[in-house]
Amino acid sequence: MKILIIFVIAITVVGVQSKDGYPIYSTGKSKGCKIECVINNKYCDKECTLKGGSSGYCYFWKLACYCEGLPDSVAVWTYAENTCGR
């Protein structure tokens, strides 16, 4: 029973320490912009896993990669802190 409780707590903690969102470029001319795509899920999945995420896909309507399970240390795009093109 104790092992089950520890397992549930561990899963909860892992869930709290990850986030989902649009990863952004951290350098170059596109700094602060979402990583763009058209229909290439493999590309986005690779970019997301390289950043420590669990998976990723191309969100077609936004033309940008969307990552799931990113570490909190990875910057993601937010409307409030949008610096793309500035």
From Swiss-Prot:
One Pfam family, short name: Toxin_3
Highest taxon listed in the record's lineage: Eukaryota
Tissues in which the protein is found: Expressed by the venom gland.
Record has Signal as a keyword: yes
One MF annotation (Gene Ontology) recorded for this entry: toxin activity
Disulfide bonds: 33-84, 37-58, 44-65, 48-67
Domain remarks: Has the structural arrangement of an alpha-helix connected to antiparallel beta-sheets by disulfide bonds (CS-alpha/beta).
Name used for this protein in its record: Neurotoxin LmNaTx1
